[in-house]
Amino acid sequence: MENLALVTWTHDSYDDIFPVYFGNIEKFFPSLSKSYVLINEINDSISDNHLQLINDENVSYVSRWLGCLDHIEEEYILYMQEDFVLYDHVEEDKINNCLEFLKSSDCSCVRLIRSGLNSLDDKVESNIYKISHFKDPNLSFTHQPTIWKKDHFIKIMEILSPQSIRDVE
């Protein structure tokens, strides 16, 4: 999975779930080559397999994201949160299919979980459906496991300019 980084948004107050979350990533996604943790302060319970990028809680949510993304060199990011716990092995061929789709399309992202808010009328590839966000652009970003083109993620964050995490829920 060349050029893909796992990016976990979290907070040190959720450290009770870290052993399960990060342990399951290492167990069920061993081929993952790069993992970043966007967190408010260094947490010793997170292994060195995951590079911790510290964000300042005193600035806006968008600024925290953009500041951390400056340190991520990969072109694609897999957005996660600490409560998106893996419970089985990652089907890497499907992740690779999603990456190939993103590389060859103008789509910004591929959500890895279906939302009940969108119909599945526009199938563009096996198990990939195009969703229009024109009805409600605030749904361009959702807190779901999603593979993003990093540059598109940055544009969405700049457009939405959320001041807090609640502004994009």
Please annotate each region the language model reported.
Residues D15-F18, N43-S47, L86-H89, K94, ...:
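Short catalytic/ligand-binding loop motif for oxyanion handling, primarily in non-cytosolic enzymes
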Residues Y36-L38, I77-Y79, S108-I113, I147:
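A structural signal for short, well-ordered beta-strand segments and their strand-loop junctions
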Residues E75-V85:
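Short beta-strand-to-loop acidic/aromatic patch adjacent to the donor-nucleotide binding site
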Residues D88-N118:
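Conserved donor-nucleotide/metal-binding helix-loop-beta segment in metal-dependent transferases, i.e.
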Residues K123-N138, H152:
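Short, flexible, basic/aromatic active-site loop/helix in glycosyltransferases
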Residues S140-E169:
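Catalytic core and acceptor-binding pocket of nucleotide-sugar-dependent glycosyltransferases
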